[in-house]
C-alpha cells in the first residue's frame, strides 16, 4: 500500500457507483476527497463514512448544471491525482420526449455539464502534466435502441467527447482519460426498473471502476462481459436489429 495521499475531486459524489469507487480507493491507499454535489446533508454523510475509512474529506455544495457556478476555485492550490465525474440521470423516455424543456435538461445533465467540467479539469491536468480524468458513461451509448435512445444518445456524445480528449493527450502518457461504461447497475437511479440477471451491485461496479481508474484504462466495460453483449448488439444487421424490442 502506498503511503502517499491520493487526491481526488469527485463531481456528483452522491452517485452510488462513485461512493463505492471512493470506498475501494480508500481501502487501498490514503486518500483525500473533495466531494461536490447539490445535497449538502448527503455529501456530509458520505464524507463521514469515508473519514471512518481513514480518508480526509472536504465538501462543496455546488450546482454542477449551472455554468456560472464557481466551483473551480475549490480546485486551486492543490495537485490532483484524479478528477471523477459521476453525475447523471436516467429519464423516463416517453415523458421526457413529450416535454421539450425536459429533453434539454437531460442533455445538460448527461452530456453538456460533464463535458464542461471535463474541459476545466483537462486544463488543470495539462498544467500538471499528469493525473487521471475519469467519467461515468454507459453501455447505452453503444447503439441507439428504441427503449432508451434519449439517454443513450447523451452517453454516445459523452463517449465521443472523451475519445477526442484522450486523443488530445495522446502525447502526454502521464495524463489518463478514462471512460467507464457500466451496464445495468442496482442504484437509486434504477430503483423503478425490474431487476434481472444482468444487473450488478453498485459495490461491484464501483470496485471495478477503481481498478480501471488505477490502471488508466481508456475504456472499461463494467463488468467486462458487457463488452461481449454490446459487441453483439452493435454488429446486429439493421434488418435483424429492427425486429428486436431492445
Model-inferred region functions:
Residues 14-15:
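Conserved glycine-rich cofactor-binding loop
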Residues 29-45:
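Conserved glycine-rich Rossmann-like NAD(P)H-binding loop of the short-chain dehydrogenase/reductase
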Residues 143-149:
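Active-site loop immediately N-terminal to the catalytic Tyr-X3-Lys motif
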Residues 138:
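Residue(s) in the substrate-gating loop at a strand-loop-helix junction
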Residues 88-104, 147:
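Conserved mid-core segment of classical short-chain dehydrogenase/reductases
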Residues 179, 194-231, 238:
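C-terminal helical subdomain
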Residues 118, 154:
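Active-site helix of classical SDR
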Amino acid at each position: 500500500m502506498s503511503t502517499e495521499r491520493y487526491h481526488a475531486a469527485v463531481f456528483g459524489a452522491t452517485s452510488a457507483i462513485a461512493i463505492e469507487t471512493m470506498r475501494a480507493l480508500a481501502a487501498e491507499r490514503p486518500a483525500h476527497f473533495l466531494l461536490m454535489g447539490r445535497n449538502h446533508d448527503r455529501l456530509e454523510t458520505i464524507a463521514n463514512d469515508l473519514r471512518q475509512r481513514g480518508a480526509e474529506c472536504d465538501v462543496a455544495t455546488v450546482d454542477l448544471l449551472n455554468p456560472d457556478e464557481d466551483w473551480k476555485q475549490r480546485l486551486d492550490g492543490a495537485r490532483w491525482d484524479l478528477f471523477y465525474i459521476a453525475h447523471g440521470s436516467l429519464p423516463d423516455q416517453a415523458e421526457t420526449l413529450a416535454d421539450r424543456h425536459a429533453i434539454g435538461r437531460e442533455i445538460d445533465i448527461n452530456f453538456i455539464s460533464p463535458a464542461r467540467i471535463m474541459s476545466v479539469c483537462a486544463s488543470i491536468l495539462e498544467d500538471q502534466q499528469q493525473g487521471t480524468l475519469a467519467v461515468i458513461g454507459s453501455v447505452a451509448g453503444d447503439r441507439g435502441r428504441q427503449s432508451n435512445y434519449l439517454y443513450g444518445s447523451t452517453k454516445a456524445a459523452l463517449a465521443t467527447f472523451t475519445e477526442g480528449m484522450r486523443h488530445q493527450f495522446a502525447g502526454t502518457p502521464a495524463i489518463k482519460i478514462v471512460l467507464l461504461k457500466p451496464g445495468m447497475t442496482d442504484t437509486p437511479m434504477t430503483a423503478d426498473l425490474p431487476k434481472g440477471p444482468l444487473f450488478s451491485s453498485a459495490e461491484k461496479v464501483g470496485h471495478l471502476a477503481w481498478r480501471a481508474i488505477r490502471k488508466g484504462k481508456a475504456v472499461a466495460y463494467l463488468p467486462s462481459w458487457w463488452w461481449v453483449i454490446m459487441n453483439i448488439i452493435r454488429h446486429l444487421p439493421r434488418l435483424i436489429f429492427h425486429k428486436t424490442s431492445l
